[in-house]
Amino acid sequence: MRLSTVDLQKRLNPDKPKGLHMGLTVLIAWLAGAAFILALAPYGIWPVALVSPAILYALLVPAMTGRRAFLIGQAYGTGLWCVGAFWLYTSIHVYGDTPAWLALIMIALMGLGMGLFHGFLALIFNRVVGKQPLSFAALWILQEWMKTWLFTGFPWLFVGYAFTEQYWLSSLAPVAGVFAVSFVAVLLAASIVELLRRRGGYIIPSIALLIISSTLWLINPQWTKPKGTPDLSVSLIQGNIPQDLKWLTEYQIETLKIYATLTRDEWGRDIVLWPESSIPMFQTEAVGFISEMVAMAKETDTTWVTGIPYKDEAAFDASTDKYPPFYNSVVALGAQAEGLYKKQRLVPFGEYIPFQGVLDILPNLAGSQDIMSYSRGSDQQSPLRVRGHNLGAAICYEVAYPDTTRKNAIGTDFLLTISNDAWFGTSAGPLQHLQMVQMRALENGRWFMRATNTGVTAIIDHKGRIVERAPQFERTVLRGDIQARVGNTPFMRFGQYPILFIMTLLLILSYLGKRTKAPVRLVK
């Protein structure tokens, strides 16, 4: 049988694109990334978490130059971050007193920077590995993982979070963490594209993994079990202190009065929990107030847990020109309580200055980081001791780090997180933050108490379900009961290492497979 020139070209280069204009392709990629926010809280339209990466996959499958692939991935990532993390605009413009135009530029630059992760994903997918769903999903997971540590990390907007309450898929979280959930979702999305291209064989791994996750959901294995002690009554205090007043010296006493008043009727509960930095001064400056609260807690047999800036009680050392370190911390006080936890994962530019050594080169800024920055707590800290239980803690932003929370959860009976999301106003940021706490509860099989300044204050069970929830932007108290649990989920035992090993192996196999294939033409 003789083949025409056209038929021969199709066989040699079956993936040659039909000819979408580059500008239109980039726009579609940007919109696909921007739309992903609809999959997360507060919108919760989880199918978008399949459609969004599916569009990126479909745009990248045709043969093309590395430059074209990178621009498509970069556009997707930029749209994802400019829209998905637009809540940063509130903190930059409203509370940072940055002009609106400059705040928008800063958001755009942040989007371009974070978009590089998807840009390089697309480049590697185009040039290094075979173009098929397994390699695409594996690259996706590795770029999500890199966001937990590269350049201090910004682990937000993971695909897996869209499925937090879709237990037919999030049942994988206690086994291998949020990355496993992301992997199956992205693999399914890419496989559906291949199914539409009449390459149905690619859907088989997705179906197999969905059968596993659905089976786990149906049989409902109890990775952890109740400790066998009575549930603890807890009161979570939401002070609703305006962010523009919170750190004013003249408002500090008023803040303390607000929290003391809200707590007045809660003494006698097992645990009273105050939010992050609810005492807006160092412990050395609030000795009298703290003593009064501790006395009341002991008198009523209540454990009082509060966020507070903690300063080592050393004086300024003139010989070294160093100030004593200070920490964003949470402390357990009162009846049957002891322990201090110092935040490990600090917010870049908000709590510390990254790359501090560079400042020492500049004469006018040398040593200034000692005054401006919180210090990082050790990654080897003991749990808080509360009423005969071990209590693991995570402060604000660090609950977004799966491995940090996992390590803090080992050997504990339940968990707490305290936060101040007033920085982000009525945006989606606080609700995305809450969704991540739900995933951490599910991964570790532990109940979570979450106390915040303006919301969302909540109690979450070991399956990631919100049991009690306070309204946002109200001065209120959330009451409920929490259960102590023991045992370790597979994720707690092994962490993210198994899933990362599997992803790396898939990429190595895909790379080796690509090398055996004949080259195809590249389209600019």
Task: Name each model-derived stretch.
Residues 2-223, 426, 437-440, 452-460, ...:
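Membrane-embedded alpha-helical bundles of multi-pass enzymes
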Residues 221-498:
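Soluble catalytic domains of enzymes that build or remodel membrane lipids, polysaccharides, and related
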